[in-house]
Amino acid sequence: MQFMMPLDTNACAQPMRRAGEGAGTERLMERLNIGGMTQEKALRKRCFGDGVTGTARCVFTSDADRDTPHLRTQSSRKNYADASHVSAVILGGGTGVQLFPLTSTRATPAVPVGGCYRLIDIPMSNCFNSGINKIFVMTQFNSASLNRHIHHTYLGGGINFTDGSVQVLAATQMPDEPAGWFQGTADAIRKFMWILEDHYNQNNIEHVVILCGDQLYRMNYMELVQKHVDDNADITISCAPIDGSRASDYGLVKFDDSGRVIQFLEKPEGADLESMKVDTSFLSYAIDDKQKYPYIASMGIYVLKKDVLLDILKSKYAHLQDFGSEILPRAVLEHNVKACVFTEYWEDIGTIKSFFDANLALTEQPPKFEFYDPKTPFFTSPRYLPPARLEKCKIKDAIISDGCSFSECTIEHSVIGISSRVSIGCELKDTMMMGADQYETEEETSKLLFEGKVPIGIGENTKIRNCIIDMNARIGRNVIIANTQGVQESDHPEEGYYIRSGIVVILKNATIKDGTVI
């Protein structure tokens, strides 16, 4: 039997469990098999700054006195990753075509999620929870609301950065480059290399974490950086097992027994897709049906040595614009590129359907992912709203955000955003309602109704199912939104809605008149 004990005078020895011996957060150690290699990852609290928690291992041998365990420290690692020497770059994404119409007036990372958060809060919070507080956010299309949210939440929202900073870098036209828009993920970083390089040198940055702003997951990035350091990798790609239905939407990787990436293909199809199948039996401890996940996909999360990043963007691959489609397929041939498999919950919010499903999944029991974790909280803009007010309502499997006002309504399997108003007799099922960023008083609501207008929120006796309702939408009385004809794709912008993958999407600030049937 073995024990793990933090090298802390106030800590006590606790049993070490291998995968399968314990469940959930009770596991203190898990083994991750990559091919023929076994990588041991200690699940322990890391000290931010210069200190790092170490461990001692107690081993009972056949001749040992079991009443007097002998401790020996473990010194297999020579270098520990220091969060103070790590910087993060969060890519704000492109035009957000796949999430349209939710991205018609906002950047993808600014899309509301989980009732009161924005997608940008996911990588930002993961950074803070990992001890990484030197962050750059690259923005481009429809970035006004994203910039506003970042400012309110992270630049003026009370989060203490100590020696850290958050800087927003918007796409800018340069004198020698008439086309100011980012041409790809690598080009986005390259265009601001003059700012980044100066920052890296001043702060002794050794490693750079590159992140996406359109994913839902919880990760300690310093665990990824530590593996990057242990492997002495030039580039480390965070990967996840996926099924065949989505494989062609991602960059796929193959790696050898040491975890070194030997092949990278961006969004392969046909024979190329088939050639990227791998034996995922090494994930049997984490995946029930390993045959369902025959591919390993890049999560779009990378760790690079600072010097390697500067070299590939300024010199070696200065003409290439994108990491996934151009740089990584070449880098695996010329650099030490390693894979790190992530088996916890991860969802790429790349389409209306995946966005819708991921939000509603938050209401299921037990949920695959939840925002409730006091040790690794997710931050968002402080709004100082009152608690939700519910009068004679029936609520089942739902998330209700602050500031809501419900009266004698029924809500099931739905996520309701901040400051939402749902009136008497309403029925909502399988609905993602983003809420409102403004209040209309009872007097204002009564006046609008008297004038034959529609106030913000949902009017009396309205029935809604399988729907996304964007911010500040006005839905009248006796409306039915159910898509009973099963239409998959349809555009009705003049009427205030679209249909994507069979899901009705009510536009931001749209007005749906009384008695409308969709």
Swiss-Prot record:
**Keywords in alphabetical order:** Allosteric enzyme, ATP-binding, Cytoplasm, Nucleotide-binding, Nucleotidyltransferase, Starch biosynthesis, Transferase
Task: Name one matching Pfam family.
Answer: NTP_transferase
Report the EC code(s) recorded for this entry: 2.7.7.27
Q: How is its activity regulated?
A: Activated by 3'phosphoglycerate, inhibited by orthophosphate. Allosteric regulation. Inhibited by inorganic phosphate (Pi).
The subcellular localization recorded is:
Cytoplasm, Cytosol
Name one molecular function that GO assigns to this entry.
glucose-1-phosphate adenylyltransferase activity
SUPFAM superfamilies hit by this protein: Nucleotide-diphospho-sugar transferases, Trimeric LpxA-like enzymes
What GO cellular component entries does it have?
cytosol; glucose-1-phosphate adenylyltransferase complex
State whether keyword NADP applies: no
Family that this chain belongs to? Belongs to the bacterial/plant glucose-1-phosphate adenylyltransferase family.
Q: What does this protein do?
A: Involved in synthesis of starch. Catalyzes the synthesis of ADP-glucose, a molecule that serves as an activated glycosyl donor for alpha-1,4-glucan synthesis. Essential for starch synthesis in seed endosperm. Is essential for both catalytic and allosteric regulatory properties of the cytosolic heterotetramer enzyme.
The name on file for this protein is Glucose-1-phosphate adenylyltransferase large subunit 2, cytosolic
Please tell me the species this chain comes from. Oryza sativa subsp. japonica
